[in-house]
């Protein structure tokens, strides 16, 4: 029982699930009566990790955003994975909204996580490794307590726990 146990904390979004959610959103868009004869588009840019929503009015853009979020939730992607970066006028009197996928654990949030773990005085060590935080300790119970602690932080990121060994 003297062996070391560990797990990794990261913030990643499964892009295949995002694609599937956007495809089902587009299918719902074609079936909805309130979008008949109205300009409405949903596009994904994998390179920039953004979702672009285009429609004729602000209310329609909000409705499209709600559709996308509901489909992402059904695919187990939390709504905190999206943040609206900008809303602007587009050609033809349309409105364009850009949603950014938050899927990287930056150094600021990594430091928040490691500080919270150290302040909890659990018998574990947390180290920042690029875009993830490695937590290691001798007791699996302490590691599970760390998972509960990080979930309680309510960070605006889709936090994932993986590689529990």
UniProtKB/Swiss-Prot annotation:
A Gene Ontology molecular function term of the record: nucleotide binding
What is an example of a Pfam family matching this protein? DUF520
Keyword 4Fe-4S listed? The answer is no
SUPFAM superfamilies tied to this protein: YajQ-like
Entry's transmembrane regions: none
Domain of life where this protein originates: Bacteria
A GO-annotated cellular component: cytosol
* Keywords of the record: Nucleotide-binding
Family (UniProt): Belongs to the YajQ family.
What PANTHER family does the record tag this protein with?
UPF0234 PROTEIN YAJQ
Q: What does this protein do?
A: Nucleotide-binding protein.
This chain's protein is named Nucleotide-binding protein Ccur92_01650
**Organism the protein comes from:** Campylobacter curvus (strain 525.92)
